[in-house]
Amino acid sequence: SSDLNLDYAGNERNYIFNPYQLVSSRGLYYLVGNHDNHDDMSTLRVDRIGNIKLLDIRRKPLREIQGYHNQNTFDVDRYMKEHIYMFGGESVTVVFEAKRSIVNQILDWFDGNVTFLNETPQKVECRVHVNREAFKYWALQYMQSVKVLSPASLVFDVREAIRDGLSQYV
């Protein structure tokens, strides 16, 4: 299928998209698949897709997508657990520290995909395998209660996002 979208100048742009699964998240529908000129998985909001044309070419095999080299079928349950927001891109193992007061929220977001490690009366250390970009925004959403411990590159990105956001207010 082809996804009609607008670039920054307002011009139409077209994509060749290899679809693998239709999913629903937070009241919206998304098509999970691969932009033909990229090697990773991404998502398109269905309500923003226009001018669809079915092409007479075979879909790219799942095994050719980054992170899916050993898979013949798309595991939608795993994908949804790792992609708490509908961002495409890589999933990574994240370790973070959280106030115990938000354990229920952690379970709401990551149930079945979270391991609780070191626990104290005030804090708990958690490990999740999750979409990197989505977790950055999740950590920002809960920044008063959460501290990312690893990977170091994500710690840096969250710190920079907080610094950039703070500069809007001071």
Language model feature labels by segment:
Residues S2-V95:
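Core beta-strand-centered patch of the WYL/Sm-like small regulatory domain
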Residues T73-V170:
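Polybasic (Lys/Arg-rich)
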